[in-house]
Amino acid sequence: MNWRRISSHRLVSQWTGKSWRSMHSPTLFRMARALQENPKHWPDGATLLDDKVALQSIRALRSKWRASSATLEHHDHGAGSRVKHGSGQTNRAVSHLARHVLTQESDAEAMARWLRSLDTHGKVLELGTSLGLTAMHFVRSGWDVETWEGCPNTMAWARSGWQSLGVEGCVRSRVGTFQSMLEDLDENACWDVVFLDGHHEGQATRHLVDALAPRVRQALVVDDIAWSEGMHEAWMAVQDSEDWRVSVVWRGRGILLKAPHMAKQRVCLA
């Protein structure tokens, strides 16, 4: 495993990355402040909306699922989960997914704050719904949330969670392969920010990033860029595209910014 891949890992980048205090660009300065965890330094306007869905409600649901004895018949169209269960038809314990696969609360809240700091309203697309908790955090940003999932059973579980918290009307959801849903899009469909957290395979990731680029107004986030050699190679490759001016590594994720006003650059945030 090479150093660049190691330094992109969530547990490493938070120690080797730069603080928000060292960001000279106003765009990166505001972004880095929103992503860090000390409320004292959050940018103005980044506070999330408890009236949409309370953090305590999401936290309680996460805890409930961690203790659940339920299983899901799960079909993975990609390369398996970030803990490397194989692809294909498998029975997956909900407790396992809740403990090891879901985005951590601190990261999901930070990304929702970042959305809120970009604008009070926008459109965000998530590819890889899983149990639906990240989408709930995104609802707290006040943005329109759309999420895609390959497994019907997983999506059904996510929808039941949204319904239990009364946010089912705040999330638009679709089921199918990412490729088929991309092909079905209206030619004018676009989002301000896209989060790609599914199909953890290098070539597929490169294809999805390239296909989504014309439909992204501001930023595209690639999760698990250090998950495998192929994923890291894909991340290194997509940064060179002229579609993106700035690439940011943050907690095991790669963030691509259109930012036409900025010089081409690569940054690692703590």
Located regions from the model:
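A short alpha-helical cap/connector motif
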Residues: 1-193, 200-219, 225-270
